[in-house]
Amino acid sequence: AVHVHAVTKGLEQVLVAAILQVTAAEMPIAYFTVGHGEDTDITGDVAALYTMVYEAGYDVRPIDLSKEDIDPNARLIIINEPRFDFGGYVDESVGLSEIEKLDAFLDGLGSLMVFIDPDHGSKLTNLNEFLYEWGIEFEYDLRIKDAENSISIDGFSVVGQYNTNTTELAHSVYEQITSLASQPKTIFRNACPIKHTYEDNTRVVDFDSRVISDVFYTSDSAEVYRDSELVGTGRYSLMTITQEQRIINNNDYFSYVLATGTKNYTASQYLLSNIYANSDVLYACMRAFGKERIPADIDFKTYNDYDLDITTAQANSWTRFFMIVPATIIVITSIYVTVRRKYK
């Protein structure tokens, strides 16, 4: 059964990619940032993530935000395990910084996925400040142990608990997964907890509404450690999604930021496994990110000229034609069939 599920999932993703290539004027672009120590070896472990994004229907490209501008056709930017910081806000006279480009991209209804290695996260000052404004604060000095929900003996390979609150954004993203009688496991290895920076999980920014929701969290009995010392117990956030709602011409538009504090979430051992749902969740998120967008700009024409451009005589001639010709064809066909049968 597991094998069938994996094959079906793969076929679905390939089919979606093929449909998008045929129907879209241009395939939407998904960028992977480079220039911050990210793993760019597409023949190595990151290949699974690149392939998954491509099979979701994206044109996958690298981008160095310090040198390149974001293509208007881009829908998604992925920051995967950076070790060095992004350029922060600068004087306008020298152009847009990397953070400012990310900000403008999200303002333009793009979406962002952030996978942070907590061992290097504390050095990402500018990126952390940017994510703070989206309700996300990583507690890099802590590691989560959830012995009650772990696939490893040490308790640090945490099985994330799905958000079952039907009123929250995260639940709607992967509702098809949580509707199963038994949900597949999603793994967070050596993860740090995420704090919400919004009071009541909402904030208004420049008249736009933002809301943050836990995509996954631990059990209520999870523990957090600092340098092998137990410093807290309770339920902790493993992955969050923030949605910004913008009203344009009385229509709602959305941008998203997905974040998790573990370098292992996108590891090939989890993305390629038939056992775990890490890839299924990311795929569900990407579909949610893109559903407010129209994949192809197909022009349509409204026909509002209802006047007849023929005379009455012409109309009568066409009427006689459609009354006589079909009847004549039927008679001739009947005669032909009768003769054939008689002399057969």
Task: State where each predicted segment sits.
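Short, surface-exposed patches at the edges or C-terminal ends of soluble domains, predominantly
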Residues: 1-344
